[in-house]
Swiss-Prot record:
<keyword id="KW-0597">Phosphoprotein</keyword>
<keyword id="KW-0175">Coiled coil</keyword>
<dbReference type="GO" id="GO:0031267">
    <property type="term" value="F:small GTPase binding"/>
</dbReference>
<dbReference type="InterPro" id="IPR050302">
    <property type="entry name" value="Rab_GAP_TBC_domain"/>
</dbReference>
<dbReference type="GO" id="GO:0005096">
    <property type="term" value="F:GTPase activator activity"/>
</dbReference>
<feature type="modified residue" description="Phosphoserine">
    <location>
        <position position="42"/>
    </location>
</feature>
<feature type="region of interest" description="Disordered">
    <location>
        <begin position="1"/>
        <end position="101"/>
    </location>
</feature>
<feature type="compositionally biased region" description="Polar residues">
    <location>
        <begin position="484"/>
        <end position="501"/>
    </location>
</feature>
<dbReference type="GO" id="GO:0005829">
    <property type="term" value="C:cytosol"/>
</dbReference>
<dbReference type="Pfam" id="PF00566">
    <property type="entry name" value="RabGAP-TBC"/>
</dbReference>
<dbReference type="InterPro" id="IPR011993">
    <property type="entry name" value="PH-like_dom_sf"/>
</dbReference>
<comment type="function">
    <text>May act as a GTPase-activating protein of RAB6A. May play a role in microtubule nucleation by centrosome. May participate in a RAB6A-mediated pathway involved in the metaphase-anaphase transition.</text>
</comment>
<dbReference type="Pfam" id="PF00640">
    <property type="entry name" value="PID"/>
</dbReference>
<feature type="region of interest" description="Disordered">
    <location>
        <begin position="478"/>
        <end position="520"/>
    </location>
</feature>
<dbReference type="InterPro" id="IPR022164">
    <property type="entry name" value="Kinesin-like"/>
</dbReference>
<keyword id="KW-0206">Cytoskeleton</keyword>
<keyword id="KW-0131">Cell cycle</keyword>
Amino acid sequence: MDDKASVGKISVSSDSVSTLNSEDFVLVSRQGDETPSTNNGSDDEKTGLKIVGNGSEQQLQKELADVLMDPPMDDQPGERSQLDGEGDGPLSNQLSASSTINPVPLVGLPKPEMSLPVKPGQGDSEVSSPFTPVADEDSVVFNKLTYLGCASVNAPRSEVEALRMMSILRSQCQISLDVTLSVPNVSEGTVRLLDPQTNTEIANYPIYKILFCVRGHDGTPESDCFAFTESHYNAELFRIHVFRCEIQEAVSRILYSFATAFRRSAKQTPLSATAAPQTPDSDIFTFSVSLEIKEDDGKGYFSAVPKDKDRQCFKLRQGIDKKIVICVQQTANKELAIERCFGLLLSPGKDVRNSDMHLLDLESMGKSSDGKSYVITGSWNPKSPHFQVVNEETPKDKVLFMTTAVDLVITEVQEPVRFLLETKVRVCSPNERLFWPFSKRSTTENFFLKLKQIKQKEKKNNADTLYEVVCLESESERERRKTTASPSVRLPQSGSQSSMIPSPPEDDEEEDNDEPLLSGFGDVSKECAEKILETWGELLSKWHLNLSVRPKQLSSLVRSGVPEALRGEVWQLLAGCHNNDHLVEKYRILITKESPQDSAITRDINRTFPAHDYFKDTGGDGQDSLYKICKAYSVYDEEIGYCQGQSFLAAVLLLHMPEEQAFSVLVKIMFDYGLRELFKQNFEDLHCKFYQLERLMQEYIPDLYNHFLDISLEAHMYASQWFLTLFTAKFPLYMVFHIIDLLLCEGISVIFNVALGLLKTSKDDLLLTDFEGALKFFRVQLPKRYRSEENAKRLMELACNTKISQKKLKKFEKEYHTMREQQAQQEDPIERFERENRRLQEANMRLEQENDDLAHELVTSKIALRKDLDNAEEKADALNKELLMTKQKLIDAEDEKRRLEEESAQLKEMCRRELDKAESEIKKNSSIIGDYKQICSQLSERLEKQQTANKVEIEKIRQKVDDCDRCRDFFNKEGRVKGISSAKGVSDEDTDEEKETLKNQLREMELELAQTKLQLVEAECKIQDLEHHLGLALSEVQAAKKTWFNRTLSSIKTATGVQGKETC
């Protein structure tokens, strides 16, 4: 049951609030809540409560002085200009008319008035103190406040904890300190505590670092108190500061000023909170240095490690190779050229010495693709002994510090510049199951480099550097000297729910402006508690056993949100797509067909989720898959086709599953969940949904319903996109995915729950708007309100807790149809016929226009077809001519082929005949040569025998002559005749006979040799004749270009030549 809320308005007069905006502030007070109990002193130790000075005013001032860490400022306070009113109307005129108003006295009035004691941020005294607020800071100053003290808290964003601290401090503080509070009007300003007597600044808290702001409940002793929490000393200690207002109504105005500060940003772009705008001649150069750590993902790539949003630390895995990526970008002053990086260093711990830094291996350096920054990449081996501290698993309750440094050579600077980054890290087990989030995975630090220009006489030549380094300071070092506080404010408001006014999230750097939130915004983390994953794993195991029955605990788990890693599978099971193979096959056929709405699809996909990396690239994989799904559905559903907005739902499904499965789930949502009914019959069912929503508003939010009636704001003006796109078009993705979880589980009626939740949480803002302002709020401010994931979770919890019965919705549906019937019956028939006639005339004109377009298209098509036909006929004639020529060439080629085949056969026959003849001649010559050789060998043997016999006979004769005394004298010792004349007569006769015999034998041998030579000459002549015939045949073969025959003749010639040589 929703709690009732009382609404009170504070009207601001021009006499008391001349410096305030001309807006009425709506204060929604919570009733029925339990008042925080007052604790005794025993609770101090548990909560870290510290009553400043135990009630001593001197001790209280001393404690506040310790909080202040800024050095004294010499700036003199100037006259503070009045604030411009945001609204128009009589109040604005009154403000301008009474522009000269005396400042409110700093001394407390003896009798409190009901008007708010607000004064311009201007000192009363002409002599300003060292701690006077900055003169150019636009702020609102509140008097008559009492500072009750501060306490340390562990849950800085907890409203219950803050109210408890407020109750304890108010009850236990005996002596308090009167202060003046200065609240800036922009988020770049600073909340300041001033001494009401001397206007001296006691403490300051930058507005962008305040975490939480809360006021006491009406009807309790703390109703005149408010408090805010801030992170003390660089977010390591959280404190709550409690104040009491002498006039209770001022609490609402103070909280409203805090909310205004967070809604507005300064129009100029200051480099820092206190620095003056710099000119190109300034000696301070600002650099933005970001650090990103990447780890080996085991697939050959390096992926950025996640960053814990709560602890602001990197999550590293033990023993995994890493890369350090540093990006340096100059953001202010004249551009300095970075020449190179000559060192990337790393060391565990913080505030380390230069000697403790260890050099990393540089992989690459150079300008980024857009040329705006300089990127350095280095490899980091965590297994090195130097980095053992950051390679051991870190306990869950601890974090480690790591220092990274990069040394850069800047062309215009005389010496190298070192940028030093200190970050927190946690080391996990290498096997730990981590779901990497898509959130920001880098840390960024701003550095302020002060340079001094070198005088001309000090430079050696014109090529020397122009500057020398005076100092280099980071933004963190600047803030360490100040009292720090932390980034976002949430103002609790009472009512049917506890809604908070969020400030910009910590990781959102874009300013609040009038530009709507881009669709596809929001990083969805895949991290999930192990216990939740185990619960879902058990549920899915049971569900797969019987897919037709949903498990009992499914609804409660879905209300808490399906884990991102399991959404693809769970959505298909919820939609009943576990057995839809026919849709998958049909999808593959549908994408090959043409869609009549192709142009509309192409136009819409370029506007779908431009803030998401998967869909932002024109012609990329994401847009291509999205185009296929929308095209396939437009062909599948011929009655409805493609309607504007379907691409957003298809894109959400495509982020969790492949194309085929996404198409199947889209078909199920359109048909089984009834989404396509909204597009039918001229959106008749959609108008019924609008009527149901307005009736629910009338029942649940009657004041907002009446306000919308007063400003003539109808449901179709702001809720059309909610129903047609299922909230997928404008809201962050983590919220969209949760809505789809609920829709697939509980049906399309979930839209009413979410719509009522949005209207409830925005009721207070909508009640202050007019028609134009309400439309702008729905278009711009409402989606931006849920850039914080915590706000989105609270909205979904509220939506799930809102009970809307189906019986009630059917009742409203019957009322709508009855109302439509009554309108039709009460309507004048003539007016109805005239309206129908106008509709038919418009339809007729549209059809005539379409007919003209089709006729024009037909004529154009006929002309194009005639031209194509003429070209085809010309091409056919040319091809026919080419065909006839080719046929004639084919006939000639066949005749030539036959002729050559006949000649080839004749040549083969002649070659075979000549070859046989040559072989016979060769055999004959071989036999003759063999016989000749045999005769020669016989004659040689015969000659040798005769010579041997002659030698034997001569030896015998010599022996006989030696034995004869008379003949011995005729021969000498060598056997030669001494005297020829004496022996001539005796042996002439024998010698002549022997010579004659030998001559006869020699003549016979010469005769045989002559005959053999003659036969050899005849054989050579025949061989020459054969070679001549072969030469003629060879010339004919060359003429016929038959290489195979040429090779045959060459082989025959070669063989014949070899045999002829052997014959010789």
